[in-house]
């Protein structure tokens, strides 16, 4: 059984990392969020970053969205291919944890072949 953790090494932390994924990533929309996905150069690295603008809501709503996304990514991380993902909210409603986890598992593997073939 995998130990489900999300260490700092599994998160996008620097602006440069976010900009790279935003510019080079494959764009994928779900009901609850927008994903930007880039294949990772190393086979065992899976990273997530979350961006939420102030238009989404007050600080507690933005923080809640970030927590839900990180938790969903933490649960599906062992089953994902090597990639870097930036997640942004869609609309002003908080996502459903189960649906977001399923969306991550479905859309990330679908988008990765598109990214590698377009380069």
From Swiss-Prot:
GO cellular component labels? ribonuclease P complex
- Enzyme Commission code: 3.1.26.5
Q: Name one GO molecular function term.
A: tRNA binding
Superkingdom of this protein's organism = Bacteria
Gene Ontology terms: biological process: tRNA 5'-leader removal
> What does the UniProt keyword field contain?
Endonuclease, Hydrolase, Nuclease, RNA-binding, tRNA processing
One Pfam annotation reads Ribonuclease_P
Q: Give the reaction(s) catalysed.
A: Endonucleolytic cleavage of RNA, removing 5'-extranucleotides from tRNA precursor
Q: How does it assemble?
A: Consists of a catalytic RNA component (M1 or rnpB) and a protein subunit.
Similarity section: Belongs to the RnpA family.
Described by its record, this protein's role is as follows: RNaseP catalyzes the removal of the 5'-leader sequence from pre-tRNA to produce the mature 5'-terminus. It can also cleave other RNA substrates such as 4.5S RNA. The protein component plays an auxiliary but essential role in vivo by binding to the 5'-leader sequence and broadening the substrate specificity of the ribozyme.
By what name is this protein known? Ribonuclease P protein component
Q: Which organism is it from?
A: Chlamydia muridarum (strain MoPn / Nigg)
């Amino acid at each position: 059984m995998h130990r489900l953790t999300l260490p700092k090494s599994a998160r996008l932390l620097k602006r440069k990392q976010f900009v790279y994924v935003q510019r080079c990533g494959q764009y994928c929309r779900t009901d609850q969020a927008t994903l930007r996905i880039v294949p990772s150069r190393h086979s065992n690295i899976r990273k997530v970053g979350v961006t939420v603008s102030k238009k989404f809501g007050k600080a507690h709503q933005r923080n809640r969205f970030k927590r839900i996304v990180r938790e969903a990514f933490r649960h599906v991380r062992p089953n994902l291919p090597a990639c870097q993902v930036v997640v942004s909210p869609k609309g002003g409603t908080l996502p459903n944890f189960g649906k977001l986890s399923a969306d991550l598992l479905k859309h990330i593997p679908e988008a990765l072949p598109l990214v590698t073939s377009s380069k």
